[in-house]
Amino acid sequence: MFLNCHSYHSLRYGTISVEDLVQQALDYNIKTLALTDINTVTGIYDFYKLCTANNIKPIAGVEIRIENELYYICLAKNQKGIGEINRLLTAYNCDGIEIPKHHPTFENVFVLYPLQNIPEKLLDHEFIGIRQDELNLLIQPALKKWVHKMVILHPVTFKTAEEYELHKILRAIDHNTLITKLSEGDYCKDTETLVNKKLLLNKYQYEPQIIENTKIVVNECSFDFDFSTPKNKKHFTESKENDVKLLRQLAYEGLSKRYTADHPQAQARVEKELAVIEKLNFCAYFLITWDIVQYSDHMGFMHVGRGSGANSMVSYCIGITDICPLELDLYFERFLNLNRKTPPDFDVDWSWQNRDAILEYIFRKYGKDHVAFCGTNVEFKYKSIFREVGKAFGLPKEELDALAGKPMTQHDDNSVFRLVHQYGKLLEKYPNQRSMHSCGILISEEPITNYSALEMPPKGFPIVQFDMHTAEEIGLEKFDILSQRGLGTIKDTVELIKEKRGITIDIKDTAISKDETKCNEFLSIGKTIGCFYIESPAMRGLLRRLKCDNYKVLVAASSIIRPGVAQSGMMKEYIFRHNNPTKFEYFHEVFKKELGETYGIMVYQEDVIKIALHFGGLSAPDGDVLRRAMSGKGRSLSALQKVKDHFFESCKELGHPEGLSKEVYRQIESFAGYSFCKAHSASYAVESYQSLYLKVYYPIEFMVCA
């Protein structure tokens, strides 16, 4: 019966999170619920999961509004209907095609008009929504004639009286005006909250046809989504078999180039990886990334493949990455294994000068109907919250500055400030606007509008209306297309050297720069200003303290400079142990066995996982939850808490003293959000060497381009 519910994804309008909306429905024993946020489908997948987990039938839809005017409410009969709604919104958002006020072209969508927008005739799938406070209008013959096409309309926008005031504040923020200057059409009615279903039906007891029509709409709507199947582009060629053949061919061609002599260990690694990639149906993902890199090479662009993808020998052989996994003992399983159900995640950097050309190629090659950026929700932040709420209350700039710049305890005597603070606290974590993910591109098999409406931000590339977490959950894994200045400096320097000196440098051949003698001399004394990632005062100081004179030490340095390691005290300890390898004791025997290469210090994500598994006795899946939390990819605090609880339970069972277990977990936690995987550090170290080589041997050209 509740066919028009808003969550806080109705930006600067709704006040209820999807979780709270479903929980409130559960409290009222409501068995069917429709989420119809204003012009967006952002929340429908979280809504679906929460509803089905609580035995509530979910209905997906959208409320179509242009400014303050409600055109109609769209309710999808099925998954096809969601796609039809998405395409209506996409045409408006991206192509500027005006949304029709009546009779949008739908085959699998119910349309509910408000009384204020009734067309001259209604199609079979179109109805009129009538609110309980509008029932008395049915005495008018002009409306009474439509009763046979009416349904119950009870919008839901807020939960409590306090949230109703918050709704008004949001509307004032949206209109950039004062709360007192809002007109009635700017905000919702004070009845727009969930109520007991029986009480609602009682209001319509004298219009049984309206109740019956509502039941018909509810029964004919079905939102059923398969989260388990991959939604990415399935094949690079025309079939899986040809993808397998092409990837194998490219891998062996690259193998012969990367390793000139016969190399049975490398060949065995390639075979092992190809078997896993084929079994998991990820050949297309590798080939699409290879194709993008091929285009980049053809255009003469520099790129760096980094992240966990650099653990892969196949990635190395086909040119996506440039570090040898065997040299650094990098585990392919860290990137891809048979327990992983989602596609791998390649991170590839280009120069900021070339990134747009790469993006344009992707959209052109794979089709605008199948490519879009991930979206991201920009939330209200602390200072901006109080500025925005304060403006809605009419505070002048000086008071806004004071409000945002001082702790609340210093404003206790100001009643308006206390009110602003009260409502501002409610807005924490509320989405304020949608924006473009910095680098995540989605390439889908089916039209991407089957899953989301698209929006067109100022950057000029379309975005989906959900974030990367939702994308991954529904089966869309992103390609990370990043940019940085360092690659542009290297490319420009190489071109300038050729122009001025007539010397061609194959800077992509890492053998000429990595562990080069003179480069290592510069490295060990921190003479690295202008060089990628190793030019900051902190990094130059670290290089000097480590007396860093080779690639492997630079790889470690690239990771221990991160805030998590430094703040935990482990960076200082690593420096001591590196310079005094016989003057320390390992924290525990497990640390000596698993972390001997890094002197018993957790430096990389892999090291943290090793300790969690071998000291804490966690399972591999729990280790992956921990890894994802550390890399910022996890969003389930409850899942992380379960892993933490299990860690301490397991440590107790293994006989570890409680104090020891707490200290180990403290070290693990200090890495959260900051630690690098080893392959990522190695990729950065290669680029550092490339820029250092140019600085050492061609300083004038390098400094001109830096």
Model-assigned labels for residue ranges:
Residues 25, 51, 143-145, 218, ...:
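A generic structural signal for well-ordered alpha-helical segments
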